[in-house]
């Protein structure tokens, strides 16, 4: 890390740091002086929120960050999922971004991958609402990724 990173948290807010979950009891500012892997609570997707193919991919990618002991399993599941999604989506913007997301995870930048996945949610919602991806395919993806839960 070339410079320090400062994060402000409100009372009761949680942050996931290197696999640990911290909750603060008052407004605090944290200053990270070295490299750290973290996720703010408002960016953590709960399993029940992983209801679409990209949200499932997001959930898996976040597990790479917040569960260091299971990183190898999470990464293997991510690889399987990204391969499946690349064969299922037809939208060029999503396909290009999925390839970039795969490269981000491959180079240890899962945090950046999460941000990129969130950026695709609106396009995915449009695709699913307009049935551009058959419901049977969405269900197949869900079943393939469901063992993760």
Curated annotation (Swiss-Prot):
Disulfide bonds: none annotated. It holds the Pfam family FlbT. One of its GO terms (molecular function) is mRNA 5'-UTR binding. It comes from the Bacteria. InterPro entries: Flagellum_FlbT. Keywords: Bacterial flagellum biogenesis, Repressor, RNA-binding. NCBIfam families: PRK00794.1-1. Belongs to the FlbT family. This is Probable flagellum biosynthesis repressor protein FlbT. The gene is flbT.
């Amino acid at each position: 890390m070339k410079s320090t990173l400062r994060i402000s948290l409100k009372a009761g807010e949680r942050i996931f740091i290197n696999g640990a979950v911290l909750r603060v009891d008052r407004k605090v500012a944290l200053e990270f002086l070295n490299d750290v892997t973290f996720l703010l609570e408002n960016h953590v997707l709960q399993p029940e929120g992983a209801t679409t193919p990209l949200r499932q991919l997001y959930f898996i990618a976040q597990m790479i960050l917040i569960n260091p002991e299971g990183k190898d399993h999470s990464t293997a599941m991510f690889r399987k999922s990204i391969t499946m999604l690349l064969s299922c989506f037809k939208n060029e913007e999503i396909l290009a971004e999925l390839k970039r997301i795969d490269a981000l995870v491959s180079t240890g930048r899962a945090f950046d991958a999460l941000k990129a996945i969130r950026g695709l949610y609106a396009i995915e919602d449009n695709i699913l609402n307009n049935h551009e991806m058959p419901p049977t395919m969405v269900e197949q993806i869900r079943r393939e990724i469901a063992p993760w839960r």
